[in-house]
């Protein structure tokens, strides 16, 4: 905030005499602001306009990052304090609003037959992961397996909702078919044989691997899977971190 020119507090104070007690402002800010820095912005706004309505908006185009962060003040604010906007490639806009809730990772074994969903990390950044979960997993139980990094993951007993407001914040989702202890060139045969035995004809890496190694390992997996012969049922699959190992999933 100190690097902003002009300083935000000075800028808003200069404009305050020309604005009503209930202003209509949109502050376009850096998406890299920390929670502490966002609180600083709120304190600046409160020092000038008191307890005015405010809504934080995170905007993403679905590449696993926050593209724009803005604070909507006064008449522009939503009825909820947090809002996540997803802009799809086809021009569709999905909105998720609510209050910030803290999510917790719950341990436990990874069971075959359950569903694993990798979500957009912007859900966590916006504090709306729980709001999304309440809509995504209405039936049966669900718990967060991971909440950090580029691939936050949810485990659920039933497939998640197919509504756009849910799916637009999903990277990939599938049913857990099997688990393996390691994903590497050394365990390539074990991995592909397990995937083939589970009925998967194609397997994509959705786990953290050295960027220099990932394309080579993916190509090796593709070649190995083709050796099992054509599959009339094209069942796409993926493998991702799960607990202390990895889960092979059939993509939904």
Report the location of each language-model feature:
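SAM-dependent transferase fold signal centered on methyltransferase-like domains
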Residues: 1-252
């Amino acid at each position: 905030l100190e690097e902003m020119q002009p300083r935000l507090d000075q800028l808003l104070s200069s404009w305050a005499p020309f604005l009503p007690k209930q202003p209509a402002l949109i502050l376009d800010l850096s998406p890299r602001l920390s929670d502490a820095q966002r609180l600083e912005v709120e304190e600046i706004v409160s020092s000038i306009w008191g307890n005015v309505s405010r809504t934080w908006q995170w905007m993403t185009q679905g590449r696993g990052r926050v593209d724009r962060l803005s604070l909507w003040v006064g008449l522009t604010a939503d009825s909820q304090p947090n809002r996540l906007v997803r802009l799809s490639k086809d021009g569709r806009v999905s909105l998720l609003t609510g209050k910030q809730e803290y999510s917790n990772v719950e341990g436990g074994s990874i069971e075959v037959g359950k569903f694993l969903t990798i979500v957009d990390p912007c859900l966590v950044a916006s504090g709306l992961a729980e709001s999304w979960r309440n809509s995504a997993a209405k039936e049966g139980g669900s718990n967060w397996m991971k909440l950090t990094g580029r691939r936050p993951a949810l485990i659920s007993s039933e497939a998640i909702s197919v509504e756009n407001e849910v799916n637009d914040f999903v990277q990939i989702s599938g049913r857990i078919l099997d688990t393996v202890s390691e994903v590497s060139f050394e365990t390539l045969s074990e991995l592909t044989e397990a995937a083939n035995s589970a009925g998967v004809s194609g397997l994509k890496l959705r786990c953290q691997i050295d960027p220099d190694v990932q394309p080579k390992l993916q190509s090796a997996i593709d070649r190995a899977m083709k050796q099992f012969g054509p599959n009339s049922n094209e069942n796409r699959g993926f493998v991702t971190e799960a607990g202390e190992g990895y889960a092979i999933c059939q993509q939904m």
